[in-house]
Amino acid sequence: MTDLSSWTAYFQDFGQFFNGFLFTLALAIGSFILAMVLGIFFGAMSTSKRPILRILARIFVEFYQNTPLLVQFVIVFYGLPLISDHTIMIPIYWTAILCVGLYHGAYIAEVIRSGIQSIPSGQMEAALSQGFTYISAMRLIILPQAFRIILPPLTNQIVNLIKNTSTVAIISGVDLMFVTKSWSALNGNYIPAFLGAALLYFSLCFPVAQFGRKMEQANKKAYSL
């Protein structure tokens, strides 16, 4: 059903889609903050001279990179209440932030690791010899230089994170994808619903991608001077 009436019905109920869009936006922001914190933390651990820290970081990265995000949603939202006799029950919003944040935190950790390792090791050694702690050397010397290297893959991860928020629909989160699926199934208007959802996701992802490209170009100009 793709005639004018289907689009009329879609725009009449657009408020539902917009609320789902706002939920998706809030979810993306929360997940991104968690993913960045975890990514920087485990990315730095991956380059530590202490084997135990590298091993722990590797376990985190390998586990989340090699298990499907949908499975992680099911385990956290449905599994934890069952194994804890319903003493651990995480709300849908926080479940989504936790799962998406952990999942992309593992990928961002690899991006951070590759960026750190691209910086000559002598810079860290020089910083430590000047009295910097490992953390302060990372924060003030290594990571700022690594940023221009990791910007393109980091931008890709942010875009993927936004798109992967749609997986919260599996636990009936009121995000854009869940609203789209529910509304289209109820009304039989699949094309307007999913085309509208695609445009709304595009309105989130495209500006991020463009911003990343502009930042990358600005960095290239700055370092070429």
Segments from the language model and where they lie:
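Transmembrane alpha-helices and adjacent helix-loop boundaries
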Residues: 1-225
